[in-house]
C-alpha cells in the first residue's frame, strides 16, 4: 500500500468516533438517574460566640398581703393528786400530771395528760431510843396544795404546790406530818388572770349588731355552740337580723345565711333552736312562707327550709310551746289552719314531717306549754283537750300512741308546771292549782300513777305560788321562793318542807336564773329601790346574805335584766354603780372578794360624756370551754360580741 493510502486510512479511523460531535444529529433519550452518593463528612463546628452583657435588674414587685395571725399558743399545766399505798407507791405519796391545756379552761383534764410521775413516801424509820415520837417517819417528804384567789393576786383563780421535808426547819416541828412554812423547800405557783376583747365589729362603726338579740317583742335571740363554733343572731346593718357564726378555732366571723333577703330580718331562733347530728334546727321568717322550720348543716354549710306547715304568709311559729329532741325525732308545737296549735314531729333520717296528735279538736292544745320531759323513753307534756284544762299527757315514739296520763284539777287555771317541774327518780315535782289548795307544790309518781299536795304552804284556797320567781334542785333538795317573799326548801329524801329565809324588803327576779357553786347557790334580788343585788345561800350552814351592795345612780331602774355565769368556780355578773354604770363584775366565793372586770363603756373625753353602761350579757351570755362570750356596748362600736378568756402563769420558787 502506498504512503498516501495509508495516511487516508489512519485519518478515517480517527474521525469516526468524532463524527457524533461534529454532526448535528438528534439527542438521544435521557438515561435513568443514578443512585445518590454517600453523605459527605460533617464539617468542623464553629467556635462559640462571646456572651452578651447582663441586662439591668427589674424593679421589686409590691409586697404581698399579711397572712392571718397564728393561733394563740396553749399553756402547759401540772396537777397533783394523792396516791394511796399500792402498786405505784408502796407507802403512798403524790402523783404529778403534766400536759397541755388544749381547751383553755385552766384545768388539766384526763385527755390532756401527757405524762404522769409519782413521788412516793419513804418507809417508816426504825424507832430511836432518843426519839420522843415513836414510830414516826424520819424527815419524810411532804406536800401541800392551797387555792389562790383575787386577794392572793390571782383574779381568775390559781393554786400553789409546796414541797419540803418534815425536818422542823426554821422553827417548825420535825416529824409531825405537817408541812410548816419554815419547812417548805420548793413551791410552784399557778396563777390565772381574766382578759377581755371585742370579737369583731359586725355592724360598722357605732351601729349595733345586737348579737343574740335584739331583745324586742319577746325575741330573746339565738345562741348555740356546735363543735367550737358559736351560732347567733345578729344585724350587720345591711341584711337585718340573720344567722351568724363565730369560729373559735380560726377566730373568724361570718354570716351563715340571709334567709329574709334585703334589709328585712328573719329573726332566726325566735321560738326554736335544736341541734341534732351536726344540724341546727330553728324557726325563721321569709317573705314567701312566713315563720317556719329551717335547718343549717354545720358540716357542709347548707341552709334550707325543712317544712312549710301553714300554707300562708304568716307561718306556723314552730316551737312556740315545746321543742325537744326525743330519740331520732324532733318534736315541736306548730300552728296550722286545720289543727290550730298541736304537736308535730320531724324525722331527719327520711326528711318526714307529720302531725303527732290532734288533742284539742277545733282549737289549740298548746302541748308542752307548761312542762315537758322524757321518762323511760316516753315523752310527757302538758296539754289541754276539749275540757279546756291542762293535764299531763304522754306520747310513745315506738308505737306512736298518745294518751292522757293524769289530771290535777278541773279549772282552766290548773296549769301544772306553770313555774317549775323537777323529775327526781320516779316522782315528778311541780306547782299546780287543784281548786282546793290554790297553787301549791305537788308531786306525781309515774310508777304508781298517784299524785298529792306536797305542802299546803298557805292554807286554804289561797296560793303560795311556789317558784314564782325562781327555783332550783341542789342534790335531793328543791329550793323555791313564794308569793310572800320567802325562800322554801323540800327534801325529796325525807319529804320534809321548811322555810329557809325571809327576804325582807327584797324580791327575787325571774329574769336571772340561779347558779350553783359548790355548796352555795346565787340569785339576784331587787332591793326595794329598783336595784338588783347578788345574794347567796349556803346549803350546808343554811345562811343567806347579800354579797355586796352596789349603789346605783339616782332614778336608775335595773329590773328584769342581768346575768350570772360561772367559770372555774368564779361568778361573773353585771352590776351598776355611780362610777362606772352597768359593767361586768366578778365574785370569788373562795375569799369573798368582789371586783370590776373591765370598764368597757368608758367616758368619751372628746364629747365630754361620762362613763356609760356596757350592759354585759344583756342579749347574749354563754360559757364554752373556759371562754365567756357576751354582748356589750362601747362608745366606738355599739353593741357587739365580746369574749373573756384567761392567761396562765407558772412561777417556780
Language-model features and meaning:
Residues 1-33, 42-43, 202:
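Terminal disorder- and signal-encoded targeting elements
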Residues 3-8, 107, 178, 219, ...:
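Short, well-ordered helical secondary-structure segments
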Residues 194-653:
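Feature 14080 marks short, conserved micro-sites in well-ordered regions
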Residues 15-16, 89, 154, 243, ...:
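Cysteine-centered, disulfide-bonded loop motifs in secreted/extracellular proteins
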Residues 1, 8-12, 34, 40, ...:
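Generic hydrophobic alpha-helical membrane-segment signal
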Residues 8-13, 105, 222, 449:
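Short, functionally important structural connectors and interaction interfaces within domains
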Residues 22-102, 107-194:
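Collagen/collagen-like triple-helix recognition
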Amino acid at each position: 500500500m502506498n504512503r498516501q493510502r495509508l495516511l487516508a486510512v489512519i485519518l478515517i479511523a480517527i474521525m469516526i468516533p468524532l463524527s457524533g460531535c461534529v454532526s448535528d444529529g438528534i439527542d438521544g433519550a435521557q438515561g435513568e438517574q443514578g443512585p445518590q452518593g454517600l453523605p459527605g463528612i460533617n464539617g468542623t463546628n464553629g467556635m462559640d460566640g462571646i456572651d452578651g452583657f447582663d441586662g439591668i435588674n427589674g424593679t421589686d414587685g409590691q409586697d404581698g398581703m399579711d397572712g392571718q395571725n397564728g393561733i394563740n399558743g396553749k399553756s402547759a399545766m401540772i396537777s397533783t393528786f394523792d396516791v394511796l399505798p399500792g402498786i405505784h407507791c408502796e407507802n403512798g405519796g403524790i402523783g404529778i400530771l403534766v400536759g397541755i391545756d388544749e381547751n383553755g379552761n385552766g384545768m388539766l383534764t384526763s385527755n390532756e395528760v401527757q405524762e404522769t410521775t409519782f413521788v412516793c413516801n419513804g418507809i417508816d424509820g426504825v424507832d430511836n431510843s432518843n426519839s420522843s415520837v415513836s414510830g414516826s417517819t424520819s424527815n419524810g417528804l411532804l406536800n401541800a396544795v392551797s387555792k389562790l384567789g383575787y386577794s392572793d393576786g390571782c383574779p381568775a383563780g390559781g393554786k400553789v404546790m409546796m414541797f419540803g421535808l418534815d425536818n422542823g426547819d426554821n422553827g417548825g416541828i420535825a416529824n409531825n406530818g405537817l408541812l410548816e412554812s419554815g419547812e417548805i423547800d420548793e413551791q410552784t405557783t399557778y396563777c390565772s388572770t381574766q382578759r377581755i376583747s371585742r370579737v369583731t365589729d359586725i355592724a360598722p362603726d357605732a351601729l349595733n349588731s345586737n348579737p343574740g338579740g335584739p331583745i324586742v317583742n319577746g325575741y330573746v335571740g339565738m345562741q348555740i355552740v356546735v363543735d367550737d363554733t358559736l351560732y347567733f343572731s345578729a344585724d350587720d346593718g345591711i341584711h337585718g337580723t340573720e344567722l351568724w357564726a363565730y369560729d373559735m378555732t380560726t377566730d373568724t366571723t361570718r354570716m351563715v345565711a340571709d334567709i329574709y333577703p334585703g334589709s328585712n330580718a328573719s329573726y332566726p331562733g325566735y321560738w326554736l333552736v335544736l341541734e341534732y347530728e351536726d344540724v341546727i334546727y330553728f324557726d325563721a321568717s321569709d317573705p314567701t312562707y312566713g315563720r317556719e322550720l329551717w335547718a343549717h348543716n354545720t358540716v357542709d354549710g347548707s341552709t334550707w327550709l325543712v317544712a312549710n306547715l301553714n300554707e300562708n304568709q304568716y307561718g306556723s311559729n314552730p316551737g312556740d310551746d315545746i321543742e325537744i329532741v326525743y330519740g331520732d325525732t324532733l318534736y315541736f308545737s306548730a300552728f296550722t289552719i286545720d289543727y290550730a296549735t298541736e304537736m308535730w314531729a320531724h324525722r331527719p333520717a327520711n326528711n318526714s314531717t307529720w302531725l303527732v296528735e290532734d288533742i284539742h279538736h277545733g282549737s289549740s292544745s298548746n302541748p308542752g306549754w307548761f312542762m315537758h320531759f322524757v321518762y323511760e323513753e316516753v315523752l310527757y307534756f302538758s296539754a289541754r283537750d276539749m275540757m279546756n284544762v291542762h293535764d299531763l299527757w304522754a306520747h310513745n315514739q315506738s308505737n306512736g300512741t298518745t294518751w292522757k296520763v293524769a289530771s290535777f284539777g278541773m279549772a282552766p287555771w290548773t296549769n301544772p308546771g306553770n313555774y317549775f317541774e323537777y323529775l327526781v327518780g320516779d316522782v315528778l315535782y311541780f306547782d299546780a292549782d287543784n281548786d282546793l289548795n290554790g297553787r301549791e307544790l305537788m308531786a306525781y309518781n309515774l310508777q304508781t300513777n298517784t299524785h298529792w299536795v306536797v305542802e299546803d304552804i298557805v292554807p286554804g284556797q289561797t296560793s303560795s305560788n311556789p317558784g314564782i320567781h325562781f327555783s332550783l334542785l341542789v342534790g335531793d333538795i328543791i329550793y323555791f321562793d313564794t308569793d310572800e317573799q320567802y325562800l322554801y326548801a323540800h327534801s325529796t329524801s325525807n319529804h320534809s318542807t321548811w322555810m329557809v329565809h325571809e327576804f325582807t324588803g327584797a324580791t327575787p327576779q325571774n329574769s336571772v336564773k340561779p347558779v350553783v357553786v359548790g355548796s352555795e347557790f346565787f340569785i339576784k334580788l331587787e332591793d326595794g329601790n329598783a336595784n338588783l343585788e347578788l345574794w347567796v345561800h349556803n346549803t350546808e350552814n343554811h345562811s343567806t346574805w347579800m354579797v355586796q351592795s352596789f349603789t346605783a345612780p339616782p332614778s336608775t331602774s335595773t329590773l328584769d335584766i342581768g346575768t350570772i355565769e360561772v367559770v372555774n368556780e368564779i361568778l361573773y355578773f353585771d352590776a351598776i354603780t355611780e362610777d362606772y354604770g352597768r359593767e361586768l363584775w366578778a365574785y370569788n366565793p373562795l375569799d369573798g372578794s368582789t371586783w370590776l372586770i373591765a370598764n368597757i363603756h368608758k367616758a368619751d373625753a372628746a364629747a365630754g360624756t361620762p362613763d356609760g353602761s356596757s350592759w354585759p350579757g344583756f342579749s347574749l351570755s354563754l360559757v364554752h370551754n373556759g371562754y365567756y362570750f357576751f354582748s356589750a356596748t362601747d362608745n366606738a362600736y355599739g353593741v357587739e360580741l365580746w369574749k373573756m378568756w384567761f392567761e396562765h402563769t407558772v412561777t417556780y420558787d
